[in-house]
Amino acid sequence: MSDQKKEEEEEAAAAMATEGGKTSEPENNNKKPKTSGSQDSHPSPLALLAATCSKIGTPGENQATGQQQIIIDPSQGLVQLQNQPQQLELVTTQLAGNAWQLVASTPPASKENNVSQPASSSSSSSSSNNGSSSPTKTKSGNPSTPNQFQVIQVQNPSGSVQYQVIPQLQTVEGQQIQINPTSSSSLQDLQGQIQLISAGNNQAILTAANRTASGNILAQNLANQTVPVQIRPGVSIPLQLQTLPGTQAQVVTTLPINIGGVTLALPVINNVTAGGGTGQVGQPTTTTDSGTSNGNQLVSTPTTSTAPASTMPESPSSSTTCTTTASTTLTSSDTLVSSADTGQYASTSASSSERTIEEPQTPAATESEAQSSSQLQSNGIQNAQDQSNSLQQVQIVGQPILQQIQIQQPQQQIIQAIPPQSFQLQSGQTIQTIQQQPLQNVQLQAVNPTQVLIRAPTLTPSGQISWQTVQVQNIQSLSNLQVQNAGLSQQLTITPVSSSGGTTLAQIAPVAVAGAPITLNTAQLASVPNLQTVSVANLGAAGVQVQGVPVTITSVAGQQQGQDGVKVQQATIAPVTVAVGGIANATIGAVSPDQLTQVHLQQGQQTSDAEVQPGKRLRRVACSCPNCREGEGRGSSEPGKKKQHVCHIEGCGKVYGKTSHLRAHLRWHTGERPFICNWMFCGKRFTRSDELQRHRRTHTGEKRFECPECSKRFMRSDHLSKHVKTHQNKKGGGTALAIVTSGELDSSVTEVLGSPRIVTVAAISQDSNPATPNVSTNMEEF
């Protein structure tokens, strides 16, 4: 039995030696393994120990010395490092969206057994003296090895290049895990915090901090949204707080202004400089966070580089409270981070030595403490409180600080002078506040052109009332309000003046009007007894609208219709007098444009047929006009005598045998055109109905006048008459004179038409060939 046991032990030792030789074969390639067949002696204890150690082996020889795991949660703004700590540097680049721009710089790995660890992808940035950066990207290593980062290059709209690093993790089973930056549901339990540490040379190192640490952390705001951080060489970090929870709408403060008995609400923006005294209001260039208690908000941007950190004291007896929140201006070497939910400020100086300033702020204060807010707090920052909202709204930028003034009720502003105050920070920086004086001169300017309604109604011919508007150009001060006329209608005031003859004259100051009508209503003229003369300045292209007063003005370019059917038309032949409604007669003398136009109002008799309503057919009625007289053509003793209707316009004196012809003639004087062409896209207006019928035939192409000799048809009767005379001249021979007018040759139309006409005189001479007479034509105006 003993010999058999010894043989078994020898075989086991030989087998172990064989395995040990195979294991050490990669280390010693020149050596051959030993077998137990060549040895008869017993193995020594040292050989057994070496075989046992070689059998066990080292499990981590062929693997990397360490594996780096980085957990990134961009939606929460967190980075957590596991296993070996690794430095992460923020590259000089511009942020895009909610992604963190991270670059991993791995330390050199140790080399054992001729196995080199592949380096991870890295990206670096070299900063020059002028602050410009030139990012470079290097990538090496086997893609299947762990501890690798995926670098994504993003092109910005501004032209710069961004690099986004996404780590690829490997599980125990060897599966690759790639983190999705948009989803954070699986990483909610691994919430870490970020700490900014100054490393000198305008660089900031982003490392993982303890979860229980409370200083120098960049926390979330009240809305649980990401806080974008951007690091630039030589420039401070701008921190912008996100929108606060709640649906407060931003309302611009309106300032009530009384203009002519009408209260207007003009949107204004108040701008108070740091030095006090005078301020100029304009459109702000920076935005502010909404969320005030009432929505009334005044935005003020200081013009100095350092804004005073002060607080407007509240007045319990006043209905208006102004609260100002200000801070210091960050220099190029200061870094400021804010935590809105904890109310803490942390300032880190970017120098070789790390300096941390923590300034906790009291979240709430009583009303008595707000009244005595001139005293400094222990932390060096004063409280800015509101009676209805204790939440402080701060926006910190790397430029002049934006001040925010909250007004509870826009009734009266009470601004008190603040004595000079100073406070000292822990880092040794001293800020001196500037004494503010009460506002003395405030210049207001409307943000947008404001339409101001002035109670000056104008009645249109259709019966509608239109309101004239005046645009406020500038407002210098509340006591001195200047309103510039925008070329709209002006109101004229008539003042009675006693003349040498004992009559009362109503004079109107000359007013230069460009393209706008002047309105004269009955109320202005009725207050003046025995009104006879009204002087109106040069009108240019404007007209005069008369309410209840019959006035017709000549030497006025264009046409204008009054409220009582009175028309204004340019007339260059003679002065015109019109009687409408039996109120008065108006005589207007045609003068040069630089002179005044005299309007003479005379008492007259009522005329029933002076007004003509468009669209109605006129019927023949007995004329009761006092200007009409009995006819003298057949003698006064004849029973069948005719009345003659005389035009009462001064300087005209035309006589007509029919009242319809006189009415048509008066419409020509007043400029009325009641007959409108209803053809598609035409709409021309005419004074007489026969003119409308003649015009309508131009659309239809109707030729109703036919020559009895040659059956040639014409559109107008005067063309037919001219054609008939050519036949008569051919038959008669010799020299004949043909006079053809531009209107129709019937007697009724000739009597109605009182305007000048162009007359064609054709002299026809007979030559040797009677078939081809010579015709010489000349044009004369009568």
UniProtKB/Swiss-Prot annotation:
Superkingdom, taxonomy of origin: Eukaryota
Extent of motif 9aaTAD: 465-473
Pfam families: zf-C2H2 (PF00096)
GO biological process: regulation of heart contraction
UniProt entry keywords in alphabetical sequence: Activator, DNA-binding, Metal-binding, Nucleus, Phosphoprotein, Repeat, Transcription, Transcription regulation, Zinc, Zinc-finger
Tissue distribution of the protein: Expressed in many tissues.
Residue stretches of biased makeup (Polar residues): 107-119, 344-354
PROSITE patterns xref list: ZINC_FINGER_C2H2_1, ZINC_FINGER_C2H2_2
Family: Belongs to the Sp1 C2H2-type zinc-finger protein family.
Function noted in UniProt: Binds to GT and GC boxes promoters elements. Probable transcriptional activator. Required for normal male reproductive behavior.
Protein name per Swiss-Prot or TrEMBL: Transcription factor Sp4
Organism expressing this protein natively: Mus musculus (Mouse)
